[in-house]
């Protein structure tokens, strides 16, 4: 018998992707490498230094492009090259010297992106990983777009975890932060197969049992994995004694026949959780994790 998501959450089920960033969309954008390379060289860029691509989504925004471009050019102490590609403002941030891993690190640039672009212009951004070869700008552009697309899912997860940098994600997200969601969904293009995976995941059964029995095993299991198997941290988060956390976990292992001692199972379970999260509305997720 195929299990379904608990009916209490049926209204919250949602389509996770709107198709804006499909492969066809990627192919429709022309990234003029030669032109960008020449412009960067004139600006002081030295081949071999580190680069990050930041993509701001201007879709539907009444923004003066000259004004926002001028603001973006002040980022990273002026080591910033700005290019408009369709409805996106693409910003290349680069370091002064090679092997400089700190100047454009995530922590360094997020506050300036928030203060200089996000707050004044109300636009979101996605950030690529650091790279060196400018000819890889197309892949970095993809990473930044995916960061934009999966930002909301990551932000919801951080709110559940009550992470200190939750507000920081308001400005945007880095690809490194959203990659679990990218891997989950991009590897599951067969929707019938995804539905099968979701229906057969015992997390769905745990969630249904929680609703029926007014228990919180779903939350306990998520926090245990998210806190790297630290029962004390779970106890503090859920106002329980660590021994109670361990007791509930043991009961789950026995009832649903699994073992958290197996690393591969824990890794798979984290992906299953994110698959469930992506198929719940934000309201349903908030209800599920409210204390």
Which residues fall in each region the model found?
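Cytosolic nucleotide-utilizing catalytic cores of signal-transduction proteins
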Residues: 2-8, 17-291
């Amino acid at each position: 018998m195929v299990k379904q998501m608990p009916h209490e959450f049926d209204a919250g089920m949602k389509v996770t992707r709107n198709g804006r960033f499909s492969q066809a969309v990627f192919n429709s954008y022309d990234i003029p490498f030669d032109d960008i390379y020449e412009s960067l060289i004139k600006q002081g860029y030295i081949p071999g230094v580190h680069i990050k691509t930041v993509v701001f989504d201007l879709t539907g925004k009444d923004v003066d492009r000259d004004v926002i471009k001028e603001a973006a050019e002040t980022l990273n102490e002026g080591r910033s090259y700005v290019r408009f590609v369709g409805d996106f403002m693409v910003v290349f941030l680069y370091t002064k010297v090679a092997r400089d891993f700190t100047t454009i690190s995530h922590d360094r640039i997020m506050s300036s992106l928030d203060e200089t672009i996000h707050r004044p212009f109300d636009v979101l951004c996605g950030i690529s990983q650091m790279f060196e070869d400018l000819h890889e700008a197309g892949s970095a552009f993809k990473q930044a777009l995916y960061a934009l697309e999966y930002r909301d899912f990551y932000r919801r997860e951080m709110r559940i975890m009550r992470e200190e940098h939750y507000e920081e994600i308001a400005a945007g997200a880095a690809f490194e932060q959203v990659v679990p969601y990218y891997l989950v969904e991009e590897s599951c293009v067969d929707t019938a197969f995804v539905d099968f995976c979701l229906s057969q995941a015992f997390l769905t059964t745990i969630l249904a049992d929680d609703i029926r029995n007014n228990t919180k095993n779903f939350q306990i299991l998520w926090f245990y994995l998210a806190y790297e198997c630290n029962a004390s941290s779970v106890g503090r988060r859920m106002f329980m004694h660590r021994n109670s956390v361990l007791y509930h976990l043991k009961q789950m292992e026995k009832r649903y026949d699994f073992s958290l001692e197996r690393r591969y199972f824990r890794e798979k379970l984290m992906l299953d959780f994110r698959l469930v999260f992506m198929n719940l509305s934000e309201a349903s997720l908030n209800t599920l994790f409210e204390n």
